[in-house]
Structure formats: C-alpha cells, structure tokens
C-alpha cells in the first residue's frame, strides 16, 4: 500500500469499512514500513460483536443528545422509523420493492447500496477530483443525452473512459447526484434522521447554564463520529468518499463558486432528507438539515475517526483478559514476521523503555566505577578493608566494567631467585634449578626492590664469609615472609 492513499481500498470498493491508516517508515524497524490502523479494535469489535458494539456507541450517543424512547428504538433498529409525511411508510415499501426487482437485474441506479455500486460510482468521484475548477460544479446541469449514455454504461458494468473528453464534468456531477437521489433510502439512513436533528440543536451554555445560539462544535463532531460508526458499512464508505469530494470542492470555491453551504443545498435532499417528502413536510427542519450537511462538509476530515474512549473500550475488550483472545489472534501473534508487524505504538513504547533502561544502567555503571576508583585510591586502613569485604559480598553488582581494569597485583619476588643471585656472586657456581612451587606465581623477570637494596648493603661478594652469607640468607628469608604477607593483604584489597 502506498503512503498518502488511506481511502484507496474504499474507492475501489474492496473494503467493508473505512480504515484510517498510518504508515511509518522508521529506520529502526529494519527499513520495513508498518501500516497501523488506530481504529483496529473498534472495527474488530464492530464486525465480530455488532450487538456489543452498537450498545457501546448508542450509550455514548444518548449521553450527548436527548432521544426519547421511540426515537432511541428507531436508532437501535428495534422499530420502523416514523418520518414526516403521511405516505412515507407506504411509498417507502413500494420503492423498496422496485429496488429489489432492479437488484435482481444487476442495475446500479435505484438499487440498495452495495460494494459493486460503490465501485462503479467511485469512477465518477475520481474523475470529479480532477475537475474541481469547473464553475457551478454540482449546480449547473449537464447534457441529458450524455448522462443517459453514461448511466446505461454504469448499469451494464462496462468500462468507461471518462478522460476521453466525451463527457463533461457537469454531466458526471449531475449523474452522481442522480445516483444518490435514486437510492431506496438516503445515504445517512432513515433511522438516523431524528438523531441528526438533535445534533443540530447542540449549542454552548453561558456562565449561568443557559443555552445559547452558538453551536457546540466539539460535541457536534463527537456525536457525528459516534453516529457514523453505526452506519451500514457500504453507506459509511460512500459517505466518506462523498464528503471528501465536497470538502475538496469547497476549498476551490474561488474557482468553482461553490461554497460548503451551496454544496449542502445541492446534496442535503439526496443524503439526509427522507424519501418522498416535500419542503412543506419538513417545514422548520430544512434549515437544520442544510446547516447539518454544511457542518459535515467543513469538518469531514475529523468525522471518520472513532473517539479516543471508544478506541480504549474496544482495546480493553480484547486485551483486558486472555479469555477474549481468539484463535485467529493467537495465530497472528505466532505467525512469522509478526515481530516486524507489531503496532507502531507498542514498538515505540518498547524502544523508549529499552532506551530508559540503557541510560539507567549506564549511570549506575558510572557511579560504580567512580566508587571503585575512590576505594582503590584510599590508604590502607580498617575502613578500606571493610569496604573491600562489602565489595566481595556482591561481586557481580559492584565489579566495574572492563574499561576500568582492576590493577594487577604486584608480582612477588621468589626467594630462590635471590638465593641463586647470592650464590652466583659469592661462590661462582651454577645454580641448580629448584622444583616448581605449588602456587601458580610465575618466576619474576627482575629482582624486587627490597632485595636489590639488601644486596647493595652486603658490599663486595669477594670479601663475604660463609657465616655472613648464612646471616644474610636468614635476613632474606625473614624479609621474604614479611613481603609475602604484605602482598597477600594487597591481593585481598584489590579483590
């Protein structure tokens, strides 16, 4: 799917519901775009559990507008809608009967709305998107002969090349209105008629709590969002395509001279007025209905998004308990490549959590390294030994990282090396290699500092006697023991 075409599926007629899609090309996601539908759980609940979904939406509609028992039952589909006009019910019955006959013949015009009909009409909408600058669009009638040719072609399902120049934009615009006007019921349905009248009455309140004449746009948008959620799927799909077309047309009113209000006057009788009623039947409601359609055109870009609380309720319905997880959901979670197709919000949250954990771990390691340096540089004391013992109790948590290497323990001078040096200096005899020591300390490559000082005190080896040599060896052994004990204590300190 290409970015920037969220309604492409609906224009082709291949989708059953409007999907608001967000396409992300985040480089951290292996350069694979992720398509995320924020209303996924809303549409899932709508298709899998329509009764639960309808009850959820209608309960929130009644919170915004006051619907008496009869009108609420009509909205829920429990009663037939009672519409203005004495013969509205009977004429509606015969009109529905005629539409069924037309549907059997595969006729698009005059038949109930289907995906096939939307696919045919979407050709007209796409063509009009390219010709929005025509002055008087949707107001100036086209040529009736060309319109009949185009209508027959749509009913027969033949391919039409609207860009060939054979048809004018006014022909196509008039035919689109004709299609909407010949539907068995208006695009916004009869059972929603009274709800739209109540939405038009939503106004702001003053400081004293009294109603004013200023429309409450936020509540009206919220009510329309909810009402559009319970429209039949084909009606909702075509309504979105139509309102988007009218919105784009009104944006070019400096060229086509068609404002949102002018467009509402053209389309309100086709998409909102009940069938077979006159202006006298509607009386004072005509202004409300026209203003309502004007409001829909101006705010069409906001009306097909589910309110945030509906999204949250639908999400909790499926994710709040493992018992709600279906087999299809489990297959989706375990399918190959599901990690790359996780919702964008979940991946973003996981990335933020991992970054936060890395920052916290980095700060902890820096603090531990600083503490380790401080303790290591302390002079030998009881306090230092106590801290070292505490370090030894938790080696994994308090061991500094590899960039701060533990200073190596100084190598101990071996007594055999010093003894061999004395014998070579005094006796001039070769030294026999002694057996290897049990400990793993390797032979030092140089004489320790203390042994060098001791050797310098001995004077010339040529004048040294055997007794003096034994005395020096005894001193050497004692010095080695002290030095070995001192080095052992330093080894423990370094650990």
From Swiss-Prot:
Any GO molecular function: GTPase activator activity
Composition bias, Basic and acidic residues: 350-362, 433-452, 470-481
Domain Rho-GAP per the UniProt entry, residue ranges: 98-304
Residues forming coiled coils: none
Ranges where the record places region Disordered: 327-362, 393-495
SMART domains documented for this protein: RhoGAP
Top-level taxon in the UniProt lineage: Eukaryota
Swiss-Prot/TrEMBL keywords: GTPase activation
GO-annotated cellular components: cytoplasm
Annotated site, Arginine finger, chain positions: 139
GO terms, biological process: regulation of small GTPase mediated signal transduction; signal transduction
Any single Pfam family the record assigns to this protein: RhoGAP
Gene3D superfamilies in alphabetical order: Rho GTPase activation protein
SUPFAM superfamilies: GTPase activation domain, GAP
PANTHER family for this protein: RHO GTPASE ACTIVATING PROTEIN 18,19-RELATED, RHO GTPASE-ACTIVATING PROTEIN 19
Function: GTPase activator for the Rho-type GTPases by converting them to an inactive GDP-bound state.
Protein name: Rho GTPase-activating protein 19
Organism of this sequence: Gallus gallus
Encoding gene, per UniProt annotation: ARHGAP19
């Amino acid at each position: 799917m290409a970015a920037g075409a969220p309604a492409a599926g609906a224009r082709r007629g291949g989708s059953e519901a409007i999907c608001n899609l967000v396409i992300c090309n985040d480089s951290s996601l292996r350069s694979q775009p992720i398509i995320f539908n924020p209303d996924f759980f809303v549409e899932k609940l709508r298709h899998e559990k329509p009764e639960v979904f309808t009850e959820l939406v209608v309960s929130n509609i009644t919170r915004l507008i006051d619907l008496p028992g009869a009108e609420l039952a009509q909205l829920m589909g429990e009663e037939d809608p009672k519409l203005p006009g004495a013969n509205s019910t009977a004429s509606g019955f015969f009109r529905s009967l005629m539409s069924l006959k037309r549907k059997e013949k595969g006729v698009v015009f005059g038949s109930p709305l289907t995906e096939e009909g939307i696919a045919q009409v979407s050709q007209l909408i796409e063509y009009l998107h390219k010709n929005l600058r025509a002055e008087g669009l949707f107001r100036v009638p086209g040529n009736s002969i060309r319109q009949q040719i185009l209508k027959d072609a749509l009913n027969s399902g033949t391919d039409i090349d609207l860009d060939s120049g054979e048809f004018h934009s006014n022909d196509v615009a008039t035919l689109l209105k004709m299609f909407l006007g010949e539907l068995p019921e208006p695009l916004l349905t009869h059972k929603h008629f009274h709800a739209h009248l109540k939405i038009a009455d939503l106004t702001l309140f003053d400081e004293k709590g009294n109603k004013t004449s200023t429309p409450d746009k936020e509540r009206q948008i919220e009510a329309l969002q909810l009402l559009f959620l319970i429209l039949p799927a084909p009606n909702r799909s075509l309504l979105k395509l139509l309102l988007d077309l009218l919105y784009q047309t009104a944006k070019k009113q400096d060229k086509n001279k068609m404002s949102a209000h002018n467009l509402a006057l053209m389309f309100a009788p086709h998409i909102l007025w009940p069938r077979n009623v006159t202006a006298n039947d509607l009386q004072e409601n005509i202004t409300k209905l026209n203003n309502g359609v004007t409001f829909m055109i101006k705010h069409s870009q906001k009306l097909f998004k589910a309110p945030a609380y509906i999204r949250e309720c639908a999400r909790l319905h499926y994710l709040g308990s493992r018992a709600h997880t279906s087999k299809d959901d489990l297959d989706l979670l375990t399918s190959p490549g599901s990690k790359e197709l996780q919702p964008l919000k979940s991946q973003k949250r996981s990335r933020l959590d991992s970054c936060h954990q890395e920052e916290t771990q980095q700060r902890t390691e820096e603090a531990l390294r600083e503490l380790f340096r401080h303790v290591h540089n302390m002079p030998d004391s009881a306090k230092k030994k106590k801290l070292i013992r505490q370090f030894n109790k938790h080696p994994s948590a308090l061991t500094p990282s590899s960039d701060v290497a533990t200073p190596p323990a100084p190598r101990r001078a071996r007594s055999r090396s010093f003894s061999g040096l004395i014998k070579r200096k005094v006796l001039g005899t070769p030294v026999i290699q002694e057996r290897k020591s049990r400990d793993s300390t390797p032979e030092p490559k140089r004489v320790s500092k203390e042994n060098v000082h001791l050797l310098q005190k001995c004077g010339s080896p040529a004048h040294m006697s055997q007794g003096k040599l034994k005395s020096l060896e005894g001193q050497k052994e004692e010095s080695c023991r002290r030095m070995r004990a001192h080095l052992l204590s330093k080894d423990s300190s370094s650990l």
